Amino acid sequence: MTTLAQYLNTKATTPALNDVITTVTDVGKTISQLLRKGALADILGEAGNQNVQGEDQKKLDVLANDLLLDALAQNSHCAGVASEELDDATPANVDGSLLVLFDPLDGSSNIDINMAVGTIFSILPYQRQGQVSENSDFLQAGNQQLAAGYLLYGTSTVLTLTITDNVVMFSLDPDTNDYVLIEENVTIDADTSEYAINASNYRYWRAPMQQYIDELIAGETGVRGRDFNTRWVAAMVGDVHRILCRGGLFTYPFDTKYANKAGKLRLMYEANPMSLLIERASGGATDAVNRILDIEPIDIHQRVPVVLGSKNEVDYIKELHLNHTDK
């Protein structure tokens, strides 16, 4: 039985990375405990305000954000923290060598109905040690990530992590309060018959995405010649976890529903860390044309379309978009 601490001692590239990952995952234990208490801890319901994204915050959104922010601010290796919930990045320790970005509680609309939610995190190098970190320091492409992962709070609490060339999973043992290794080399099959998409936005999609979904719905009677099933958790962390466990496709494509937004999901807090996990598990991740991990960010709250999962389906969607005259 291998614990997270034992794994990090042998795999983490530096003591600093080891320590920051430990800080994030320790906070995950606290969030997991709060979620199990639910209404008994008075953490359900609305917080009464909105985040920088214009979304109504849940009480646990705010609490999870504050727990992570406070813990990382006390970590000497962390130079700065950026959260999906806050307008600007928060400087931490000027001598730190790492930057941490996180979505404190992905899928928070699921909290009050007792469905899966999670914490997504990304760790980047900090290049200006000795100086106070700024928003611009976080504007690095996803291919620069030193580590990425998520904590899924479901029937059990699962940590999925990548710090080398592979993806591993740990389960939080409620008896010992340790993360215990359960999967050492997560791999996604190239082919799949499952897809996750919010089909209510169909009329807002570009023609290539409409064509793709039409083909899947036609199933064995259409050009694909086989049937597909829809799965939708309404939390990216839940859908990505299912894909890492048994393959599949997840997409939140470009749409015209909100003309001023390039996509629904955030590049820095969601798309980049999840894309790194998916690619290192032999899957693919694109905005329908470009590799997500190669996108050069211009804002810490930048949004992008996302298509990720089983590689053959991701490649096919990209081909449909590249071959379409109105891309």
UniProtKB/Swiss-Prot annotation:
Main location: cytoplasm
CDD domains xref list: FBPase (cd00354)
Cofactor: binding details: Binds 2 magnesium ions per subunit.
Keyword Cytoplasm attributed: yes
Localization terms from the record: Cytoplasm
Catalytic activity of the protein: beta-D-fructose 1,6-bisphosphate + H2O = beta-D-fructose 6-phosphate + phosphate
Biological processes, Gene Ontology terms: fructose 1,6-bisphosphate metabolic process; fructose 6-phosphate metabolic process; fructose metabolic process; gluconeogenesis; sucrose biosynthetic process
Top enzyme category: hydrolase
Coiled coil segments of this chain: none
Keywords for the protein's UniProt record, in alphabetical order: Carbohydrate metabolism, Cytoplasm, Hydrolase, Magnesium, Metal-binding
Origin: domain of life: Bacteria
Record-level Gene Ontology MF annotations: fructose 1,6-bisphosphate 1-phosphatase activity; magnesium ion binding
Cofactor: Mg(2+)
Pathway: Carbohydrate biosynthesis; gluconeogenesis
GO cellular component terms, A-Z: cytosol
Disulfide bonds: none
Family, as annotated: Belongs to the FBPase class 1 family.
Assembly description: Homotetramer.
NCBIfam families: PRK09293.1-3
HAMAP family per the UniProt record, alphabetical: FBPase_class1
Stated name of the protein: Fructose-1,6-bisphosphatase class 1
